[in-house]
Amino acid sequence: MPFYGLRTLPHMPVLSESSATVRDRLLSLPPLLYGGLKLESRYLLSPLAGYTNLPFRRIVRELGGVGLATTDLVNARGLLDRSPKTLQLIETCLADRPFAVQIFGGDPVIMRDAAQLLEARGVDSIDINMGCPVSRITKVGAGASLMCQADRTIDLARAVVESVKIPVTVKMRLGWDSTQLTAPAFAREFEQVGVAAVAIHGRTREQGFSGVVDRTGIRKVVEAVERIPIIGNGDIRTVEEGERMFAETGCHAISMGRGALANPWLFRQFVEWEATGEYSPAGTFDDRLVLLKRQFEYAVEQRGIERAITSFRKMAHWYLKAMCVSASLRNQLQEARTRLEFDTALDDIASQGPTRGSRSGLLPSLHISVPAGPNANW
């Protein structure tokens, strides 16, 4: 049963008149389909390395509104080698459906075999990573570097599509740099070889996460295809930013990664907005504390207490920043080594409350900053 938190706050006001036009278009569209897979909403959780693990996917699903959730990016060769660390990335549960696994690699045979392994394990959809900008991925011919190898990349996509019966999608960027904006051409070719959908992040590899998303570039990808859905991605942290993505690109769906870290309620807000033009606010301090504790318990279930404490620090940082927790208490939780120390830190956080905003009301919006270039550490 979805978990809706403790909210008693009023709905946010109706958005602009242009919002109604966007909503009318969305409501007139047929359901979002990845091949034969029908998605319950057009609001998707993007793959985000280190964050979109099973515990977090369970949380956003409980809050509602997610049409599809995708894993962290997964090394195709690691899957075939049965690496325990890699296999943990694809763990799922009954509540985590439908879900996709995003794989990366530059060898068509390895990618094909990894796709077949995933299909045998019951995965609903496979996503090919063509967007990761970090050097450790691109230097092995994977991620965004695939956008520089047209023939090989099309052959890779075809090999994966033809090897499985489940839908195969691609996530890519606009291109390698501003002189190689190859996304529209790739999208056309992907449609021809049977790719079910394309998600497009509106920056180049050279940009990393710097600058602003180029929605005009995303629109060119939308216009390049005839049938398959295009998913807009990048800088969608609020309903208003999502509305703008729909309005300026004509995309069929949107996906969020960093925005969902700051506001796990974002998917439900979009569903409410699409249906009514209004949406309920994000969670309060108390709501977020409940979510933090719940996600930590899911991590304990999956990894055991010691590994959960270590691995959860990365996620806890963003929870606590969004909750406006003092730096000293954030540090206390980050330094916890035992279950007792972790629980004590949470008790202290609950006792002190937020340093800004109020415990039961709206909190200031959190902006998750990232490095300017193609950097894995943020």
Task: Please state what every model-predicted region is.
Residues 62, 112-126, 130-142, 150-228:
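Alpha/beta enzyme core
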Residues 86-88, 141-147:
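Short glycine-enriched, charge-decorated loop/helix-capping segments at active-site entrances
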Residues 43-46, 69-71, 99-103, 126, ...:
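Hydrophobic faces of well-ordered beta-strands that scaffold small-molecule active sites
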Residues 22-33, 48-124:
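Glycine-rich, positively charged N-terminal anion/phosphate-binding segment
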Residues 82-86, 149-150, 200, 214, ...:
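Short, solvent-exposed helix-helix connector turns and helix-capping sites enriched
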Residues 48, 74-76, 104-106, 131-133, ...:
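Active-site beta-loop-alpha junctions enriched in small/polar residues
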Residues 2-39, 43, 49, 55, ...:
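Alpha/beta catalytic cores of nucleotide-metabolism and tRNA/nucleoside-modifying enzymes
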